[in-house]
């Protein structure tokens, strides 16, 4: 894997932290990383090209894995407003399960880094692969994924051309997963909360500048204060009368 990256770099291709994370995942056999890498790649491929399922089914090793049944529904999926690539899947699963948003941290955790002692420990690598695998499986859940897409469409975003920021959509799905797992949140209100957050962050371009830094802050503050408390704070700070009377008008004029 390292040799492949060296060859890619020699040709001037720019690699990001998700690429490095995928290299670590693909090279890992001990904790099932090689099969996890396939699941991530296959999901992103099927979300764009459902008919490719027949080709995927030829991979007998994968079809006998825990992931195969999680992807089967995609062969009949024709939804186009959310077709995540491997970068999106990794980012969402990471934010959801680890409470962090900086992808370089995922690379370090998969390598076993202890952020407190600055040492590398095998148990941290094992735990990190386990958490990431769990996050990816939750990401792929048909009911969860489909209901999230329906929520976004119900807010008026009915076509992919209306989605002006993929990373904003990524955070919205992360939030959907987090709220589903939060016992303190009324499950009947999750769609409502996610829609409000998505519309607010879209209108204010919250994740356009330094997205990882802002998402990292949001994730940590949601964990510390609870979603409802933090949402009220962010809403009050960003959707004041000044925003509606001046900032939004200027945005619509450009």
Annotate each predicted stretch with a short phrase:
Residues 254:
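Histidine-centered nuclease catalytic patch
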Residues 19-22, 59-251:
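A cross-family structural signal marking well-folded subdomains
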Residues 1, 10-11, 178, 200:
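Short loop/turn segments at secondary-structure transitions that flank enzyme active sites
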Residues 2-79, 84, 183:
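Extended, regular secondary-structure scaffolds
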């Amino acid at each position: 894997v390292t040799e492949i990256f060296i060859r890619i770099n020699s040709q001037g291709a720019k690699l990001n932290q998700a690429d490095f994370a995928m290299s670590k995942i693909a090279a890992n056999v001990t904790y099932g990383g090689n099969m996890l890498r396939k699941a991530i790649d296959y999901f992103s491929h099927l979300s764009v090209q459902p008919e490719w399922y027949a080709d995927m089914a030829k991979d007998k090793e994968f079809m006998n894995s825990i992931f195969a049944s999680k992807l089967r529904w995609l062969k009949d999926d024709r939804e186009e407003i959310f077709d995540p690539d491997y970068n999106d899947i990794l980012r969402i699963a990471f934010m959801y399960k680890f409470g962090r948003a900086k992808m370089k941290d995922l690379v370090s955790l998969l390598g076993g880094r202890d952020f407190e002692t600055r040492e590398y420990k095998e148990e941290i690598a094992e735990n990190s692969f386990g958490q990431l695998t769990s996050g990816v499986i939750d990401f792929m859940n048909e009911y969860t994924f489909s209901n999230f897409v329906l929520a976004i469409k119900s807010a008026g975003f009915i076509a992919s051309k209306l989605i002006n920021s993929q990373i904003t959509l990524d955070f919205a799905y992360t939030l959907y997963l987090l709220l589903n797992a939060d016992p303190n949140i009324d499950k009947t209100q999750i769609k409502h909360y996610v829609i409000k957050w998505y519309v607010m962050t879209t209108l204010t371009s919250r994740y356009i500048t330094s997205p990882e830094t802002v998402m990292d802050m949001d994730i940590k503050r949601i964990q510390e204060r609870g979603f409802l408390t933090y949402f009220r704070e962010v809403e009050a700070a960003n959707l004041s009368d000044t925003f509606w009377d001046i900032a939004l008008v200027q945005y619509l004029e450009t």
